[in-house]
Amino acid sequence: MKQELKEKLLLLADKYEVEEFIMDDPIQFPHRYTDKADIEISGLIASWIATGNRKAIIKSGDRIDHELFLNAPYRYILSEEWRKYRGVTSSFYRYYSWNDFYILCQTLYAAYREHGDLESYLCHSLSSGTPLERLQSVFGHINGMPALSSASEAKKMCMFLRWMIRRDSCVDFGIWQKFHPREL
């Protein structure tokens, strides 16, 4: 059984660990950037909205990237333009409101102002814990962020962490060096 599972996993890796996969997946958004902060922010937002139909996710991601971020996620967060969405309860994407987006941006703003990048912020948020536990401790108060008791929400955040931490893939970035892939 173990060998059969290993072979199946290797076949899946061969299918999805290719550059062609990027075009039709939410990971395309952070792949548009080269700056660490832009990759982190774009990746976190892309994983946050990764609920539902892939085409709808990509359409919404494009809207965020082009209309809100103006292709500069880090600059957008530091500009504080997102503050205008405080208390706005209308729909941002599916079951997320504009106020949810505001809270996410506010948390990202604090992370970048205090530590310069999200990786460092997570390292300082708790003295110990897995990357997922650290991510949850910082972003868990936001609608749609990981509740460690919810496998579906944790799955999205594990996807984001894999993108940032895993180093042996053309799909993933491996830009976070303070965490080891074994911790995923």
Segments (PLM) and residue ranges:
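HhH-family (HhH-GPD) DNA N-glycosylase catalytic core used in base-excision repair
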Residues: M1-L184
